Structure formats: C-alpha cells, structure tokens
Amino acid sequence: MKDTYISEAVKYIGADDTTLDLFESQYQIPNGVSYNSYVILDEKVAVMDTIDERKTDEWFANLENVLNGRMVDYLVISHLEPDHAANIKRAADKFPQAQLVLSAKAKAMLPQFFDIAHLDERCLVVKEGDTLELGIHKLHFVMAPMVHWPEVMVEYEETEKILFSADGFGKFGALSAEEEWTDEARRYFINIVGKYGVQVQTLLKKAAALDIQTICPLHGPVLKENLGFYIGKYLTWSSYEPEEDGVLVACASIHGNTKAAAEKMVEVLRANGASKVVFMDLTRDDMAEAVADAFRYGKIILAAASYDAGVFPPMEDFLHRLVHKNLQKRTFGLIENGSWAPCAAKGMKGILEGMKEVNICENVVSIKSTMKDTDVAKMEELAKEILA
C-alpha cells in the first residue's frame, strides 16, 4: 500500500477500486485504480473533491473518521468528471452549511449532473489568482481549462506547499498495487490527457512559479520526493517529444503472415543497431499501451494487412487514436501485405499525413501473402533508413 500520509492537517480519504474492469469504459486496468480525495483540517475544514459512486460508502466513512465530529465548511470541486464528482450532491445534502468552491465553468456545468437546492447561494465561484483562507492554511486557485475538461482548476496550499493537481500527475493502478510509477502514469496521461499537450504546458508554466513540495493527484500515489522527475516526464509527454530512443513495431495481422513479417522486422532492426525495439500486436495487445509506446519512442514501424480495399481495422483504429491524441514529431516506416492488391500502405500514409511534423520513410515493404527473401531485403533498406 502506498503511503497516504500527508500531514497532521491534510488527510487522505480516497479509496482503491480493484474490481473495475475498464476505466472510462475503454482502458484496461489490471491493477485497479484509486479515486483520491483529501481533507484540510484548520479553523475551517475543506474537502478537496469527492470520489466515484462505486466507493461512496467507503469515502463517507473515511471522511467521518477524519472529521471526528466537525462539520465541512468548503467542498472544493476541481473537476466534474463522475469518478471525482459523483458524491457532490450527497455531500452538499449532508453538510448543508458547506460552500461549493468551484470555477465559473464548473458552476455552469454542475446542474447538468445534479439538482442541488439553492445552488447560487451555496456556490463560491473562484477565478485565477483567488485565494481562500482556512486559518493557517491558504488555498490559491489556478485555472487549468482542458486539462482535460473545460472547468478544471488546481489548488496550491501555500503553508504546506501542496499542489492539488486534479487529474494531473495521476496514474492507473490502485494504491495497493506494487508497481513503479512511470509506465502506468504514461499510459494514463497519453490516453486521458494526451490530446491537450498545449494546455498541460500552460499549466506547467504556472506550476513552475510555485514552491511545490507535495503533489496530491486525483488518481495514483501522493508524490513527495524527486518531484523534478515527475514534472520532467510531464514536460516531455505534453511536448510530444520522444521520451527515449527506440523503435515501436506495431502490427495488425489477419492470419499471421503480416505478424511474421513484423517479427522479422524486429530482428532486422536489432541487427542494424537499434538501441531498443518494442513489438505490439494490435489485434491482441492492450491498445492503450500501444498508444503510450507510440508516444514513448521516436520511430514507429507499422505493419498491416490490406482489408476491404483499405487497412485492417485494428491498425486503422490505432492510427486514428494517435491522431486523436495529437501524436507528432515521429518517423514512420510502413509494411503492407495483400494477396491480390496490397493497399494498406496507402491507407496508413493517408492517415499519417494528417499528423503534425511526421516523416514517412520512402522505403515501403509490400508483401504478397507470405514473406520472401526479396521482402527481407526491403526490410534491410527500411531499417537503414529509419535508423539513419
């Protein structure tokens, strides 16, 4: 279990979810996920977000335990997505004296989710640079629109130098899971927030002006040490620069012949000095991990079967995800297969040309049904070009 202790005045009241199969009904989470929420205990009590309704009872139990009979003065709403906001109405009803602290956009969106009586009187709308004094503790509000919803804000507590970062610096994986941070944080960032790199960069510039000693995200562990490492990862991911040198070989094969060619391409790349080669079978491997690997490495080989005069759907799905997540600044190589009219390369190239700052290798490997020695020779040429 990850350490959730923050301080005597700032408490963790979130919960792990280890039975949810798909996050956002699309992303595999074999090690679950945490829904994080926090309480600041001072002259005034502030609750920092709620959690998913799957863990409502646990959240209220944790909250009551920390409050020890005290009442809530403020419920700070950083983000209205239901995995963080599901219990806003329940909390508002339970603590009728509490003010809801939120951005103007969040106030406008709130009635779409909940019918809260006397909403105007209950809301304390804050904007960029506003502060809220709780006693010794003082919250500064920083707007973070489109990271990754329009109403999002983060909060900086100046006394203990804590950044409550909303979905920023989150990761997949329950706190009970024993795993390192980077891989599941990368997969989370790329697939949840990746499209909004410019907005993340804007937020990081604001954060750079703050003296941050602890980061409290809405998913994943509380970050207390080596914060420069985590911030550095976010700077790289949000700038769309490759994280490390290497080649991703992603294939979509119908009967196995295209996969055999892709596996041979892996061998050829290694023989030609590739520092690292990663293979993903898009028909069976986790698509979200494949997308994350495309962000991780600067060079990508795509191997796809032709299908219905186009591209085999798993590859088409993968490429559209890359476009949707705004991948850019990459070099691509293409391998196609077709028994009578290979056309996958043309289809893949058409999608890639919609991306920013991409280079597509001139050498294209076009296979007729099964791999031949002449195809391997073409792979050698492609390997030399993409590794140059």
Identify the residue ranges that each predicted region occupies.
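Conserved beta-strand hairpin/beta-sheet module of binuclear metal-dependent hydrolase folds
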Residues: D3-E64, V154-E157, K161-S165, T258
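Active-site-proximal loop/helix segment associated with metal-binding centers of metalloenzymes
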Residues: H148-V152, G168-K195, S238-E243
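Active-site metal-binding motif and surrounding structural segment of the metallo-beta-lactamase
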Residues: E43, R54-V101
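Short N-terminal or domain-adjacent regulatory/targeting segments
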Residues: C216-E243
